[in-house]
């Protein structure tokens, strides 16, 4: 049997005024990805699948996001906002190409799944002309009701037009639809705007399908899957649902979470086996954590790769470009950025490692700072395998510390250090026997006039 081709049109032209934000609504994020990205990633892909995104005239950023997520996406502009059917027909050129299945979705429903799109296509394979996604909200007030007779959809009745009996129906319209591509354009072009707002409503397609003697049907899904985002409160609710999904998926994959509700994940986080995540950890986009790694409490990771049996935290911040080798350790109050830390290396306390490469087995003492920025550009620090950096050292980049080299505590290193060498760069220690006693005696007699280290007692 030949695989059916598909066109998915994602409507993303809404202004989103209730978000109270300068950011287009569909670019707000859930689990580290834009609302639009979640929908695009759920849409069919691969051979025979095409994608179109309808944007507003002033939303170049939305077009750019669509191309970032799905380079195969075509974008079309809805220059006037005249209803959902009008928005779909902005992509008339794509529809006319004649895919077998036409899917219509919304860019502000980030919880919809690929499986739901596939279920919505099944009635088309079975001969239906139109399939509408339905759901049962806790409170159906305000939603269009789906009127079903004999297993077929006969109408979508808006709340204002519904009879008292129809308002008792709990099956509601989610807005997501699938059309048989052979008849989709003809049906869409028959939708008129004879209503109080003068707009073209996609819901009118049901009546047109019925008038043509064709079949419309309903596929039901959960209310969460079609949760639309119009306010910041709804955005937070969607985040909570997504985080619950991600946590459960991680737990089912074998990740140990001591307090799952305190852990926040990104949609693209990947885990190996026997990973442990302690409480109050935030994992942003682009993080992969290999087998046996432990992420201790109160750590924050973004765009970082964690090797097997590595350890992070507690209270660590791993910024983009961090790569932690197998068995390496990042300890408490350590920040890394664009740092490659090879297997077995240790950065245990109170340290900043930026634009650096640390060799295998190196030890970075507490309070070490890689001074990577000169006010104009970033510079690289290279620390060889097995090197030992004493506590409270400053490494002024660009600089290379050779393999096996030792850096004395408190040093400021601005020149390269050869392999196996010792480098010390600090003021010499001076000891004056009895000075402290004489100073205290002088103070007690009121002879010391200042509050600093006074005059030297001779």
From Swiss-Prot:
GO terms for molecular function: glucosamine-1-phosphate N-acetyltransferase activity; magnesium ion binding; UDP-N-acetylglucosamine diphosphorylase activity. Mg(2+) binds at residues 108, 230. Gene3D superfamilies: Hexapeptide repeat proteins (2.160.10.10), Spore Coat Polysaccharide Biosynthesis Protein SpsA, Chain A (3.90.550.10). Its EC number is 2.7.7.23, 2.3.1.157. InterPro entries: Bifunctional_GlmU, GlmU-like, GlmU_C_LbH, Hexapep, Hexapep_transf_CS, MobA-like_NTP_Trfase, Nucleotide-diphossugar_trans, Trimer_LpxA-like_sf. GO terms for biological process: cell morphogenesis; cell wall organization; lipid A biosynthetic process; peptidoglycan biosynthetic process; regulation of cell shape; UDP-N-acetylglucosamine biosynthetic process. Its main location: cytoplasm. The active site is at 349 (proton acceptor). Acetyl-CoA binds at residues 366, 372-373, 391, 409, 426. Binds 1 Mg(2+) ion per subunit. Keywords: Acyltransferase, Cell shape, Cell wall biogenesis/degradation, Cytoplasm, Magnesium, Metal-binding, Multifunctional enzyme, Nucleotidyltransferase, Peptidoglycan synthesis, Repeat, Transferase. Its cofactor is Mg(2+). It is found in: Cytoplasm. It comes from the Bacteria. UDP-N-acetyl-alpha-D-glucosamine binds at residues 11-14, 25, 78, 83-84, 144, 158, 173, 230, 319, 337, 352, 363. The keyword Disulfide bond does not apply. Residues 1-232 are annotated as: Pyrophosphorylase. It catalyses: alpha-D-glucosamine 1-phosphate + acetyl-CoA = N-acetyl-alpha-D-glucosamine 1-phosphate + CoA + H(+); N-acetyl-alpha-D-glucosamine 1-phosphate + UTP + H(+) = UDP-N-acetyl-alpha-D-glucosamine + diphosphate. Catalyzes the last two sequential reactions in the de novo biosynthetic pathway for UDP-N-acetylglucosamine (UDP-GlcNAc). The C-terminal domain catalyzes the transfer of acetyl group from acetyl coenzyme A to glucosamine-1-phosphate (GlcN-1-P) to produce N-acetylglucosamine-1-phosphate (GlcNAc-1-P), which is converted into UDP-GlcNAc by the transfer of uridine 5-monophosphate (from uridine 5-triphosphate), a reaction catalyzed by the N-terminal domain. In the N-terminal section; belongs to the N-acetylglucosamine-1-phosphate uridyltransferase family. In the C-terminal section; belongs to the transferase hexapeptide repeat family. This is Bifunctional protein GlmU. It comes from Rhodopseudomonas palustris (strain BisB18).
